[in-house]
């Protein structure tokens, strides 16, 4: 959704990656999924990186993979600099990303959590809305 929002890509940190494209696990070369699919259908072979021969997979962070260091640093800096930190549609159960709301709160931000279910961070929030996100957004005309 954030790609379709019109926000400049340079302002987006994808802590958990992105399933709309793929990356080489060795050199991080980006590949478009449609091209990989076409190549696979032609050869019936799993794709390998054209640069280094590494394994290519969707650009999401899988269980056991480290969080992307650069994106974590940017996100931590933005949390510290924020005066309002809004968590939308997240269980806040995956660390270290789940620490970001507390980091923002500890440095003076107002913390808002909007999620269909309660989270373990609700107790720290200034405002908690446990409702369907689409209903809330339609009511406030976002």
Residue ranges and their predicted role:
Residues 1-142:
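Conserved catalytic alpha/beta core of Sir2/sirtuin-type deacylases, generalized to analogous enzyme cores
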């Amino acid at each position: 959704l954030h790609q379709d929002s019109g926000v400049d890509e340079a302002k987006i940190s994808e802590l958990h990656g992105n399933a709309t494209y793929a990356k080489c696990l060795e050199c991080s070369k980006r590949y478009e999924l449609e091209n990989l699919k076409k190549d696979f259908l032609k050869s019936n072979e799993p794709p390998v990186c054209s640069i280094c021969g590494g394994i290519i997979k969707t650009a999401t962070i899988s269980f056991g993979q480290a969080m992307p260091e650069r994106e974590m640093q940017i996100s931590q800096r933005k949390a510290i600099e924020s005066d309002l930190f809004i968590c939308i549609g997240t269980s806040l159960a995956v660390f270290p990303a789940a620490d970001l709301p507390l980091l923002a709160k500890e440095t003076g931000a107002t913390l808002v959590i909007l999620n269909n279910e309660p989270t373990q961070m609700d107790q720290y929030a200034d405002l908690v809305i446990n409702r369907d996100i689409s209903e809330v957004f339609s009511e406030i005309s976002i």
